Amino acid sequence: MASAKSGERGSSSFAMACSLLSRYVRQNGAAAGELGLGIRGEADANKGKETMELFPQNSGFGSEAAAVKETPDAREQEKRQLTIFYGGKVLVFDDFPAEKAKDLMQMASKSSSTAQNCVLLPSSATATVADNTKVSAVPAPASALPVAQANAPKPVRPNAADLPQARKASLHRFLEKRKDRLQAKAPYQGSPSDASPVKKELQESQPWLGLGPQVAAPDLSLRQESSQ
């Protein structure tokens, strides 16, 4: 019985201690945070919750203040110096915005396209302009022209009397070449007078080859005498 009573007293004292501690923490939340108990007071609980942006609009790791500071520098960089070469003159403009420069370039391109689509000149005028440009494009020194004309070879004009002689000479050469070709094709052919003695010598050296045509006619007179 004594042990049961002592247990009830201990549990009641522990419950009282916990209730006192909770009251103290609620009243003094900052002090409890310093103690490191991990319990926040009523003031911390009433603070608004901060949300984390998973898809930020400004890329990069810099803060918004840094981004705001960079914008005027970018605007200053857009304004630069512009130089224009027109009509043999140089025009310089300081702090010229980039947007106006783009507009100016578009206007210049449009004007160049309209100039190309202008009315064409007549053929005679274009021919004269082309001739003038060709002459002016390659200027020749005045001192070199007479020397070049003097040293230029004069064309040879053939005389009418020399033409028949040249034709005869060419014909004679053609006939000589043709004769040489014929001799080269048949080198062993000769005249018929040269071939006749050769045939006679062959017939005399080989009489047996010509027995048929060279057989003499029989002498009938001798046979008649013997028969008598």
From Swiss-Prot:
Spans traversing the lipid bilayer? none
Which keywords are on file for this protein? Jasmonic acid signaling pathway, Nucleus, Transcription, Transcription regulation, Ubl conjugation
Post-translational modifications: Ubiquitinated. Targeted for degradation by the SCF(COI1) E3 ubiquitin ligase-proteasome pathway during jasmonate signaling.
- Domain Tify per the UniProt entry, residue ranges: 75-110
Instruction: Supply the induction statement.
Output: By jasmonate, wounding, and cold, drought and salt stresses. Down-regulated by abscisic acid (ABA).
- Find motif (Nuclear localization signal) and give its ranges: 166-173
Q: Which InterPro entries match?
A: CCT_CS, TIFY/JAZ, Tify_dom
Its GO CC terms are: nucleus
Q: Cite the PANTHER family for this sequence.
A: PROTEIN TIFY 10A, PROTEIN TIFY 4A-RELATED-RELATED
**Quaternary context:** Interacts with COI1A and COI1B in a coronatine-dependent manner. Coronatine is an analog of jasmonoyl isoleucine (JA-Ile).
Q: What is this protein called?
A: Protein TIFY 10a
Gene encoding the protein = TIFY10A
